[in-house]
Amino acid sequence: MGLAHYFQGQFAEAAESFRQALALAQNNDSVIDCSNWLYVSLRRAGKTAEATQALRRITPDVKNKEPHLLFYLRLEHFYQGALTEQAVLPPKPADPNDTEAELAFDTVTYGVGNWHLYNGDAKGAAELFRQVAKGNAWNAWGFVGSEVELKRLDPTQR
């Protein structure tokens, strides 16, 4: 339910869903996943102090098992200020059929774009969202989120 609320712009409701999921998290992968979405939901809801607290379980010694969760973990370190934007952003995939590279690019680029958005840089955010929307990983949450945000930023866009 959290992602459904999130992509509909119901950020407080999304945060509550992710807060509940985080309370039930039984391993690092679940903590990493839920913490990321809780953080961005709270930031989008304007609750910066709460968002910072949402990442309290993300410490330098937290490790992921599932490879795709490394993308979220690196984003969380970026949100905490431990990584720079340049360090966290992956290169645009050279091969559009490289699904792992596309997933990494879309996930992290959307996350950094979202960070620009809630820090007042809508133009920078839109540039990053457009890069993601040009890709092929339409089933990645970063791709979905980029299309949603581009529509929110410019409702005349298809």
PLM segments and residue spans:
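Alpha-helical adaptor scaffolds
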Residues: 63-101
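TPR repeat positional signature
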Residues: 35-37, 109, 142, 147
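Alpha-helical junction/boundary sensor with strong preference for TPR arrays
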Residues: 25, 62-63, 136
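Residue-level recognition of tetratricopeptide repeat
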Residues: 3, 40-42, 114, 147-148, ...
